[in-house]
Amino acid sequence: YKRQAFMWPCYEMFTNNTIRTSLNGWGQNGPYKGDMDAGYFEQKYESGYNDFAYQTVASVASGNGWNFSSFIRRINIMLSHIDDSEMTEAQKNHWRAVGYFFHSFWYMELIDRFGAVPWVDQVLQEDSPEAYGPRIDRKTVADNVLERLKWAEENIGDFTSEDGKNTINKDCILAAISRFGLREGTWRKYHELGDYDKYLQESVRASELLMSAYPTLYTGTDGQPAAGYGEMWTTEDLSTVPGIILYKEYVTDINPMGTSYIEHTSSHYVEMNQKTVDLYLMKNGKPILNAESEYHGDKDMYATFRDRDPRMYHTIMPPYKVKAGGGTYRTWSYTDNEADREYIDIMGANTSCSNPGIGMKRLPGQNWSASLVPEIPRLGTGAFVTCRSGYYVWKNWDNWETNFNNGNLNTADKPIFKIEEVLLNEAEAKFELGNFDQGVADKTINKLRERAGVARMVVAEIDANFDPNRGKYYPKNNDAGVEVDPVLWEIRRERIIELMGEGFGFYDIRRWRMAPWFLNRPATGIWMSKADALSNNMTLYNPETGYSDGTSGTMAEGYLYLFND
């Protein structure tokens, strides 16, 4: 068991904060960070602008994941002693495969962040010349990573009886190939580096093996539309949940965390902007600007949410209003306005605030001490469960956990690799290889939509007019940008929505070469009258100037302006 104990620290890669899909931390410092960097989310400060959009990211002399003396050194030490061990040949191959997986997983991040990096595959001493060697070109390093992952796939054994459940196995390696093949293949394609097909083909191959092994999606237990989607991040035990390949287990008194707790407090700083809200389809499968969308408009928050993709309800707290009861401020009753209960009826009623409470995501909400949140939107920055855009992000929120007086009482497991990402990898890689059709859509995107309660994608219906607000990518020396292919845009939309809040955004917009489109748009909130905006110490966005209309502007209503000029 020495080899196991020596390798356990490598599992900390999945909670390493230099990796944007890291499960460590919460709020803007946890998995949301990658999607905040991508412009999908905002911080609820007046000065909470995107560092990449405003070019305020400071360079650092060290760190940011440029590290070969921690994980890489540990892995190389283990690998260097395998041949001298008394293990069987099968055991040696197994542990070499585990080492190759972790070595490759760390290098996947190094390549994404730095491009060309040193290739360190042996134990280095202080006087080793390799310790001060040059960077190796991106292609060579990426080829090495893919080669090692494929070797690991072919040689890892089934040692669950020795390693334990929920440890690195063949399926984890296939999930890494699926992710890396798509990431590197599309980066190479859109950055005109060539030799991208083999990465995309490997992504497809690995994805299809996993799709055969994990044919079922989790549908949840709490009964709301898209419950399986929402409960993937709020479930106590993921060990028996369909589609889970690897997960982070949290246990009371051992390693509890506070991702749900923080979203019940005033310290949760993550909100969604209007542009990202606009990406969510209608339940009929149409973009909101499609001529057949039946969109209800965004001049009223109830209308904005009506008949939308239910995954939106599990990511942003839906609007409502109730009358608070007396005494402990935990009971409530419905208002006389029928519209105020529309989304309470959809999500299920939190009949009386308690700690722990009822179910997963229920309305009305409650804070960390089980005090009632009487209405959403709830604008501001100081009180609990507030935000400035009106779109409060609550992906990790649940009622069933204890969220009282301490940030580290939550024990809901969190996924690391799951089949939903694999389905999206398959769809996108197939398109980039010229092989996406209705059959592929039905095996991938339409499985996700069926669970969410959204109409299926019909490839033949998607033309240049399907979404008048299609995004642009920016080839080299083309500042004007080029509209993304209509079908590819819908594939990417599905990825953005399904993986929202999981940290993939910054990886994706860069490999797609779409960062300017996502980052350079004005960050706005819900539609509001000027009087209501000013009463909340906010102003309106003026589309003619691209800035705030100010306190003395002429606009009577408009979208909330989120940041200082």
Predicted regions and their residues:
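C-terminal substrate/ligand-recognition segments
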Residues: 310-448
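Conserved, well-structured interaction surfaces
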Residues: 4-8, 12-20, 38-114, 130-165, ...
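Long, intrinsically disordered, low-complexity segments
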Residues: 68-69, 144-146, 225-291, 406-416, ...
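Short coil/linker segments at helix-helix boundaries
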Residues: 116-138, 187-201
